[in-house]
Amino acid sequence: MLSNSAICIIGGYDELSKSLFKILRNKYKSTIFINLLSTIHHNKNLYNYNIFELKKILELLKKRNVKDIIFLGKIARPNLSNFKNDGIVENYIPKLVAAYKKGDGAVLDAVVDIFKEHNFRAASPFKYCKDLSLSNSDVLKKYKKEDIIDIKKSSELLDALSEFDNAQSVVCAEGYIIAIEAVEGTDALLHRSRQLRKDLDQFKTKSGFLVKKIKKSQSRFIDLPVVGPRTISLIKKANLKGLAIDIKNTLIYKKGDFLRL
């Protein structure tokens, strides 16, 4: 990053994005955060905007001399009924409507493209914070044959589902696909898997994995899979053996606590 330019995080102001904002602000005082959640938050260099207030957002980015944008933090799917003309955003409605028909991933990709059109760079969170990722030394390198079967089956299923812009997570145990992530998110998926394993009389045996990975054609700049200490806690409660992820494309929340668990 150039010394006279700034970084901006755009997304929902949640625990993960908040933690990165704190880290970046300590390194780069000019870092700003644009919160797109409906819940208003207050902090230094934090701004609250509706996702359709594109003109105001672009003006702020230019005023603060932002070059790199990190897209991070959960946001609700934009409701087009809340749309209002602002002189710029209406130019992108056809593009967003077309993306809506394809799925959430396409909508997020369209959002990234809009900012690129205005000469901003999409930056990976990993570029500025190595603590959000795991290294090869942090992960197990050998698996039992039955574990490889569960992980491989889950990975292939997620690749197939990528065509439908759907899930990033699957639970597979003893060769059975137990549950596929839908709109409920990973925590709810693991709660559901725990109950299903009980119903299938699997729960007494520790087996299976939560497998998380990005969609095949997904942007590496937005909506990356996230795991943290709570993920590990829920994996244990579901009596699964563990977690399988793509360490190059998965964000780790509270890495120290995550590894201790």
What positions do the PLM features span?
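Short coil/turn connectors at secondary-structure junctions
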Residues: 2-6, 27-30, 42, 64-67, ...
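N-terminal basic/disordered segments at the start of proteins
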Residues: 2-36
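General beta-strand structural signal in soluble alpha/beta enzymes
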Residues: 9-11, 32-35, 69-72, 122-127, ...
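Gly/Ser/Thr-rich loops at beta-strand to alpha-helix junctions
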Residues: 11-16, 74-78, 105, 250
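Conserved mixed alpha/beta catalytic, RNA-binding, or beta-rich assembly cores of soluble enzyme
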Residues: 13-17, 101-105, 119-236
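Conserved strand-to-helix beginnings and helix N-cap segments that scaffold or border functional pockets
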Residues: 18-21, 183, 255-256
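Feature captures the catalytic cores and cofactor-binding loops of soluble hydro-lyases/lyases
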Residues: 36-42, 46-66, 84-96, 103, ...
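N-terminal glycine-rich phosphate/adenylate-binding segment common to multiple enzyme folds
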Residues: 57-127
